[in-house]
């Protein structure tokens, strides 16, 4: 039994282009800036009877269903087969870490978290590629100490919903759930859930992964969303490298009477290197075909950052700057629409404490 704590406090600056701003309402280019607390997590984890692991954590900085960050138990019958039930990370993308506070940069890739653009005025249909945390059940295991698998069923409603709201698909006559799976190959043993830790500078690990999911009747029973991803991660002494590419197809349910489906691509490459024993430099290039493969143009999103780990007190200082560029669009209107709601220039300085 082990209690734990994570508190993050940020100073944020975001500058938005004029597109989408209504000067009549005195909307400024600088918005969503100031101080924030994205996470104030209190939880406990442990293992009972030699085979039942458990974890419960509350994020006091959130509201609604998102207050419950994680709540699960895991029954390991053997290393090759275990069952996990509750609220936990879905099997897609290693950008979402289960180890608190060990991400390379304080902001996740925009290509995972930003809603895609659809050419229809359906306010309830705002899917993004990342699936994050959700409620469900999963079987998982490690075979021959290098082949990992995760296969599960989830609500598909995300981390902010803790209730059973799903039904049966009118089109496919199956439960309207998120069906997801992920398979990894780790030839040098299990990849640690970290993107940089000054206490683990002698690691030599590498991981290759592939994942797929389909969210049946998602977005208020409007769409069937299919996702496929490939990933790579490496820890080699002072160096961390990570890369992912993902694809999403959004197809509408029959009741919407929209025959077209839409395809989206995204991905990122990021790396961190400890230039000093407690100072890690970080770079990321993020790519997002936000308006779909049927239209030209995409978002280029380079980012730079640094992490400083204070000695002997579990404090970590992170800083990050990101620029969102647009390229290859057919018209100025397409270019203007592609980054609506996204800050062209964003900077974050975050101090976090873990216990």
Which stretches of residues belong to each language-model region?
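Extracytoplasmic loops and strand-loop junctions of Gram-negative outer membrane beta-barrel proteins
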Residues: 23-27, 117-123, 164-166, 212-216, ...
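Outer-membrane beta-barrel proteins
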Residues: 14-18, 65-67, 94-97, 160-163, ...
């Amino acid at each position: 039994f082990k209690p734990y704590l994570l508190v993050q406090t940020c100073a944020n600056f975001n500058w938005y282009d004029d597109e989408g701003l209504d000067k009549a309402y005195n909307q400024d280019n600088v918005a969503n800036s100031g101080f924030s607390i994205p996470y104030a997590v209190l939880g406990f984890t442990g293992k009972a009877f030699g085979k039942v692991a458990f974890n419960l954590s509350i994020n006091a900085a959130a509201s609604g269903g998102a207050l419950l960050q994680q709540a699960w138990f895991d029954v390991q019958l053997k290393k090759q087969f275990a069952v996990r039930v509750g609220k936990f990370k879905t099997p897609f993308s290693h950008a979402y870490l289960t180890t608190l506070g060990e991400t390379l940069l304080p902001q996740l890739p925009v290509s995972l978290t930003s809603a895609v653009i659809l050419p229809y005025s359906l306010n309830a249909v705002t899917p993004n590629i990342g699936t994050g945390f959700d409620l469900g059940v999963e079987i998982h295991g490690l075979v021959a100490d290098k082949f990992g698998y995760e296969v599960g069923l989830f609500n598909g409603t995300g981390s902010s919903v803790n209730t059973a709201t799903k039904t049966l698909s009118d089109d496919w006559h199956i439960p309207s759930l998120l069906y997801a799976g992920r398979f990894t190959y780790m030839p040098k043993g299990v990849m640690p859930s970290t993107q940089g830790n000054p206490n683990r500078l002698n690691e030599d690990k590498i991981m290759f992964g592939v994942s797929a999911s389909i969210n049946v009747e998602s977005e208020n029973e409007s769409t069937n969303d299919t996702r496929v991803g490939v990933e790579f991660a490496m820890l080699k002494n002072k160096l961390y490298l990570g890369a992912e590419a993902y694809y999403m197809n959004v197809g509408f349910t029959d009741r919407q009477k929209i025959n077209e489906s839409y395809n989206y691509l995204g991905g990122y490459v990021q790396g961190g290197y400890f230039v000093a024993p407690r100072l890690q430099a970080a770079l990321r290039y993020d790519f997002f075909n936000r308006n779909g493969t049927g239209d030209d143009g995409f978002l280029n999103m380079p980012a730079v950052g640094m992490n400083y780990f204070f000695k002997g007190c579990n404090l970590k200082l992170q800083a990050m700057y990101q620029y969102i560029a647009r390229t290859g669009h057919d018209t100025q209107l397409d270019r203007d629409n592609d980054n609506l709601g996204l800050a062209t220039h964003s900077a974050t300085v975050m101090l976090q404490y873990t216990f």
